[in-house]
Amino acid sequence: MTKKIFTLFAFLLLFSCSDSEPIAPSETVDYTAKNEQEIKEYLTKNNITTAQRTDSGLYYTISEQGTGTNPTVSSNVTVAYKGYLTNGQVFDQSTTAGVAFPLSNLIKGWQEGIPFFKPGGKGVLFIPAHLGYGGRPQGPIPAGSVIIFEIHLISVN
């Protein structure tokens, strides 16, 4: 019995002497200004002069208009896409046949940007972190990253 009490006491003493501090909740970082600058620099470096900016900070270009009705946030859409960072690192890509999604289940950048396209339309979305994955990393996408998507809206289902 004494041996068990001594072992328990030694165990408690060992862990009570730890010098590690409790982990604080992660701070919220505002990437808005940094992302705005990063997008502008990317557009300039790549000689993209037709990009439009929305009030939220999303930039987009439309290279092919497409025809038909624009989707809404409540639409199901089939989209072929390629997603990459401003350094060119591709993090996701669909087949040319595209992938069907309920637009309401996607990141805010897609919810806002895809409705600019008509079926058959093509273009690019330049999405700041607050409309993408925010301050948390998502697989190969670092926290606070601008993400770029080449978009081909195949259909509105």
Task: Tell me what each language-model feature is.
Residues 2-9, 17-157:
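Cross-family detector of peptidyl-prolyl cis-trans isomerase
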